[in-house]
From Swiss-Prot:
Probable regulator of the NF-kappa-B and type I interferon signaling pathways. May also regulate the type II interferon signaling pathway. Plays a role in homeostatic control of innate immunity and in antiviral defense mechanisms. Expressed in spleen, thymus, lung, brain, tonsil, heart and prostate. This is Protein NLRC5. Its main location: cytoplasm. PROSITE patterns: LRR (PS51450), NACHT (PS50837). Transmembrane segments: none annotated. ATP binds at G228, K229, A230, G231, M232, G233, K234, T235. SMART domains: LRR_CC, LRR_RI. Interacts with CHUK and IKBKB; prevents CHUK and IKBKB phosphorylation and inhibits their kinase activity. Interacts with RIGI and IFIH1; blocks the interaction of MAVS to RIGI. The keyword Flavoprotein does not apply. LRR repeats lie at residues 599-622, 713-737, 741-765, 769-792, 869-892, 897-921, 930-953, 976-1000, 1004-1026, 1031-1058, 1138-1161, 1162-1184, 1242-1265, 1272-1294, 1462-1488, 1493-1516, 1521-1544, 1554-1577, 1578-1600, 1605-1628, 1633-1656, 1661-1684, 1687-1714, 1715-1739, 1741-1762, 1795-1818. GO terms for molecular function: ATP binding; RNA polymerase II cis-regulatory region sequence-specific DNA binding. The gene is NLRC5. It is found in: Cytoplasm.
Amino acid sequence: MDPVGLQLGNKNLWSCLVRLLTKDPEWLNAKMKFFLPNTDLDSRNETLDPEQRVILQLNKLHVQGSDTWQSFIHCVCMQLEVPLDLEVLLLSTFGYDDGFTSQLGAEGKSQPESQLHHGLKRPHQSCGSSPRRKQCKKQQLELAKKYLQLLRTSAQQRYRSQIPGSGQPHAFHQVYVPPILRRATASLDTPEGAIMGDVKVEDGADVSISDLFNTRVNKGPRVTVLLGKAGMGKTTLAHRLCQKWAEGHLNCFQALFLFEFRQLNLITRFLTPSELLFDLYLSPESDHDTVFQYLEKNADQVLLIFDGLDEALQPMGPDGPGPVLTLFSHLCNGTLLPGCRVMATSRPGKLPACLPAEAAMVHMLGFDGPRVEEYVNHFFSAQPSREGALVELQTNGRLRSLCAVPALCQVACLCLHHLLPDHAPGQSVALLPNMTQLYMQMVLALSPPGHLPTSSLLDLGEVALRGLETGKVIFYAKDIAPPLIAFGATHSLLTSFCVCTGPGHQQTGYAFTHLSLQEFLAALHLMASPKVNKDTLTQYVTLHSRWVQRTKARLGLSDHLPTFLAGLASCTCRPFLSHLAQGNEDCVGAKQAAVVQVLKKLATRKLTGPKVVELCHCVDETQEPELASLTAQSLPYQLPFHNFPLTCTDLATLTNILEHREAPIHLDFDGCPLEPHCPEALVGCGQIENLSFKSRKCGDAFAEALSRSLPTMGRLQMLGLAGSKITARGISHLVKALPLCPQLKEVSFRDNQLSDQVVLNIVEVLPHLPRLRKLDLSSNSICVSTLLCLARVAVTCPTVRMLQAREADLIFLLSPPTETTAELQRAPDLQESDGQRKGAQSRSLTLRLQKCQLQVHDAEALIALLQEGPHLEEVDLSGNQLEDEGCRLMAEAASQLHIARKLDLSNNGLSVAGVHCVLRAVSACWTLAELHISLQHKTVIFMFAQEPEEQKGPQERAAFLDSLMLQMPSELPLSSRRMRLTHCGLQEKHLEQLCKALGGSCHLGHLHLDFSGNALGDEGAARLAQLLPGLGALQSLNLSENGLSLDAVLGLVRCFSTLQWLFRLDISFESQHILLRGDKTSRDMWATGSLPDFPAAAKFLGFRQRCIPRSLCLSECPLEPPSLTRLCATLKDCPGPLELQLSCEFLSDQSLETLLDCLPQLPQLSLLQLSQTGLSPKSPFLLANTLSLCPRVKKVDLRSLHHATLHFRSNEEEEGVCCGRFTGCSLSQEHVESLCWLLSKCKDLSQVDLSANLLGDSGLRCLLECLPQVPISGLLDLSHNSISQESALYLLETLPSCPRVREASVNLGSEQSFRIHFSREDQAGKTLRLSECSFRPEHVSRLATGLSKSLQLTELTLTQCCLGQKQLAILLSLVGRPAGLFSLRVQEPWADRARVLSLLEVCAQASGSVTEISISETQQQLCVQLEFPRQEENPEAVALRLAHCDLGAHHSLLVGQLMETCARLQQLSLSQVNLCEDDDASSLLLQSLLLSLSELKTFRLTSSCVSTEGLAHLASGLGHCHHLEELDLSNNQFDEEGTKALMRALEGKWMLKRLDLSHLLLNSSTLALLTHRLSQMTCLQSLRLNRNSIGDVGCCHLSEALRAATSLEELDLSHNQIGDAGVQHLATILPGLPELRKIDLSGNSISSAGGVQLAESLVLCRRLEELMLGCNALGDPTALGLAQELPQHLRVLHLPFSHLGPGGALSLAQALDGSPHLEEISLAENNLAGGVLRFCMELPLLRQIDLVSCKIDNQTAKLLTSSFTSCPALEVILLSWNLLGDEAAAELAQVLPQMGRLKRVDLEKNQITALGAWLLAEGLAQGSSIQVIRLWNNPIPCDMAQHLKSQEPRLDFAFFDNQPQAPWGT
């Protein structure tokens, strides 16, 4: 027994343990490596006896402390076959703290370190603690070599039998397959590169381990960063490098050191390089300084590897980086150990800024298919299950995609190794569907068969979760209970290593074998532990963004935790979790449901690309189809992925989710590092419609993988592969794959640096892609010869419609033929031939070869090529090197190339000499519409028009029309040709040659010339004026910016005499804008046949042309008297009519006088306009004087002293009235007399407008005094002149002195109007309207005085003048006149609140006799008519009548006053009053009043509220009014009793002439009363009973009652139900009514039978003037009957909606033709289709014609509109809701100028287009008096309608009728 055994106190137990372990020395060695990672198991121990070696190893374990010893004992009991009695003794003795003696613990701790870590860690002192010893060079070299050998030996010992992962199965240790490595093309020289690792990675160039380091001195970067996602094998590769170096493969390095940041993070102090190497790795046996000096001197042969750079702790405060990161930074930058090589491994993320910009970046991309197969072969080498494993991987696509991650591939192999012997082939699909179940099966595989240690798993999971939450990945023995350490070691869940934080500070650390395993165990704990509730659980289900640089500085440790939680939420995992949860299946189910619910919420949110990928992983792990479907459907149509790495597993997961989606999706991968085999994951994804990749990482291998996937994507329409490194090899794969994708519509290979031949290879597939619309080959530099080859492809390929090449751009646009699916499936050769045949028939090609360095010989080749090709839409060769010859060749070829739209030769070096050649070359080109050449701007553009035979189809013409109208009037129709030679430096010497070259163009169409921006000067302008007649009829000539003087400009005015085509000359002198134009409508829009040929439109435009005046517009020009004199002298010979428009900054009085003096010399002048011209205050008087001096002036309009217009009569017009407008001219009182004196010299002034001046009250007073001298016969407008009530009262006082004033109106409110209307003769009666005058009480007496003196004033209206009831009563009492009638109308807000009683009380105060009273509460109006002098009533008679009134004292007094005042009352009107609100007191008073009104002739009570009792009172009063001639009770709703009372009141009313009972409900009893009373009314002239519910029986009785009414003139029975029977009775009596003038039977259900009888009767009504029979089914028979003999005095005929046809309507029209009295006709809503409604003879009085909704078409409208000229009085034409088109509009536009009284035309809901509307606008412009033409709901685009309305406001396109005011002066 050794001493230790003796001290244990149980020698027998120790011996048993030694004997047990001696049987399995390999197991003990493995445990020694686990618990003592740096233990040296060298050959020196092999000489010992096996039992002694075991004792030595146990001693080493024992001295580590109780935790290690207890963990070891637990491992012994778990893993070895220990007898039960021995296991109990071992656990009871050593398995707990009390079994470990403190003495031995102390003894173990006191042993020297060399015994603890023999062979690896030698005791040493720090580098700085020993004095420097002098050694010779040889000794230094020996020491260094000894250390280097020690370093290599220690590495050999470490990797002798395994790679990292101690305790794992043997198979794990032997398998190593290098992953795919790709080197980045650029280093970290940008912040983006530092963040992500540069995404521009070479594809297809794998990097081997030996290639990672460039050993050439001073060549390449010294720092290498290895980037790879979790599980890619970064740590494994780092240890592999150490192993390779230990085996002598990396001879370029003498020393290699490997550090892990997870351990370095534990260092809290700053380290020197020697401390890093010797204290934390391996210390020399002696003389550390000498060894370090050697390493420093040979640093270029030293390799430092840092694993887990992403785990480096970033600085948290302002103190800078941590100690280890600082040291790492200095090593990378070369400030420490300069020249050494540094390699760091990291996950993609935000890397520290300390990395140098030139650091080499290498990406680890995991396994591709061959590597997975190789790994499986190695793993299962020499095992019978190898083939089975390969089969499983081949059949299980999901498992195969998971194996792209090397760590998962290792786990998958372990699971297959466990599953294959016990399961049938193909079970992996069910057992290993995702990553979570891989780990679950791994746990089951590592567990003892049939036994799952649930508590240990959950406890270890709790440790894992605690580590994730605290950021801890290294655990010590104190952190994990010994049984858990033993459990982790036994099941290969934990790995151990030596943690050295300084000299002498070393201890064993534990970590989970992989971070993902730690996350999986944490997820197990969360899902199965009873300590965790579901609310806590859901907090861990989050999505982590991979854009780490934007969110956090360090990658999280729980990135996969949500994925594992989602995977454990799968139903498949429930039995496993329930077992872990001790059978608590309900709790597990609730947690699973909670996880799924969180994922459902996340699925419906808008997520970034990285989170979408994370979500897809989580959803895919759940294996829930419903959740997958929800996620797939919630993904956006455009799904972008930008600037974050994606693996093949990511894309495979995305594909799995998309399988649950129905709608197509667009995937865009921009800047995402992708593995070369990534596209394989998209195989069979039928939901992808657009697929786009943009990454330098994509190369040939990527393209090859993509070519295999593309044919399987059935919906793919767009493929983009931009910015890649694809070569010819990769493109060849894609070219072979593209024809297998016939559904592709767009393909992009932008920015791929493709060669010429590769580009040509690509375009070869164009005929094989029948639906392709776009091919983008931009940013792939090609030569000119290749470009011409591509042009040939564009010409020959039948589907290409555009080739666009400009510098880097190269794009094909195609128009695939419309083909069915069956056609697409036919043989390719048949498709190609069909396509060529169709293309030859209809294709047009656009060719844009801009800035392509084309020369003259290239142009020749291109012309030859294009002549063989299809029609060309556009050819753009701008920016090349064609020069004069090349441009000439292209211009000559233009007519042969059939270019439809544009030829652009800009920026091709054209000279002035070349301009002439080009002009001659295009002279014979019939289709040229415009040529624009500007040598200064290097512009040469040819615009072409379609040939006439190519313009087919009405739809094309309509589309052309709309486009034309949108351009009017500034743009040109296709029939014109415009030649623009601008900024070409042309001088006078060039003109003759130019005009010769232009001669051929002048005869091809209407020519527009533009010579602006040249250098013609005065000589050139004069010479051009001589040459212009030789050029024929131009449409316009632009001479702007040619340096002309004022003399030359005025000289151009002579062209009016020499050029017949010149209609308008616009000159802006200062800006040198000079434009000569013809008539804009004489461009002959129908010349080419491109527009419909309307004879009416052509005739109308011809008429317009004859009437259009010539116009000279001269602006920005100094208008001095000499210039004006010369100008007028030049204009003498100008043919007329002439409009002269002048504009300058200021026009002096002398210049204005000169201009006005010259007016008599210009008899052809029709308009003189001074716009935007400053005029002096004297100008109003100068202009006013012209009204008398120049008889041709008919209107002067001066506004604001800046705008003046003079309108002149033509020579044919007779002298007539004139008008003057002087608004906003600052006229005040001092100017009034002078102005009135000048106006008094006029013969006849129809209107004078002095509004918006400064007259004030004093100026107005002065003006009113001068009024008698001014011969005004129309309107005087003085609005907006700052007047007050004083002026209103003065106007009243001056009315007696103004005999010709007929009406005056004053509004002092916001309207501020003051208008006086005159007549030519003295007016007997005058009307004055005063509104919002705010009269005060003191004004009432003055108002009354004025009214009393103005005896000719017969009517006064006071609207809202602040007169209360009291003031109104005073006014009525004060007004007194000698004799005559006077009406006062008051409208005040209080009138609607005042009762009838109070209003009658006001009337009682009148001084004259009240003859009429009218009260309307809702209109707030009281009207009183007074008669003077007042006739006093006999007091005794009044007292007698009062005695019979049952009224109170106050009411009796009021009745008495009324009886006196209203004794002569003849009319009492009450409208919309309420007689119920005062307990019938008003009706009682009215009863009393009616009893006294012996002269009352008219009583009206309409639309009012009266109680039954009140009606009885009124009926009683009315019963005594025996002289009543008119009774109106319409629009009331009385009950039957009240109605009967009123009917009884009609008894004895034999003098009644007019009776209106409309809307009263007349039942049989009330109607019987009425008919009985009617039979007594022999004087009745008008009876209105509309809407009284009268039937045929009632009509029969009514007819009998009317037999005696021989004086009846009007009968209105409309909208009853009399029917044919009632009409029959009525027809029998109508001939007996000889005075009948108006009958209205509309809406009475009369059919054609009744209508015929009625027509026969009406023929006998000789005096009939108005006949209204609408809304009855009369039909043509009735119309024919009426037409046989219409009454000769007929004025109004209304037959709307009468079921008339063309025959009936035409018969009526013929009967009405030439009717001298007809004023209105309505045939609306009848069918006139095919009928021609025409009037041949004049209808002199016809004012309105209504033909709404009569199905009138263009043909019918032609004759109808021609008839309108026979109706000189026509004011309203209603043609809405018909079928009128542009032809009808043209006809109407032709007659509009001839209709002087027409005010309104309704053309709503027709078929008029923009052309028709424009023609109507042109018709309005001819001086029509029309106020509005309504065009709502015609097929006119909104923008076009707005444009037309801006040009002509009287065109109304709105739904509501917004009629503008008529133009002033009409």
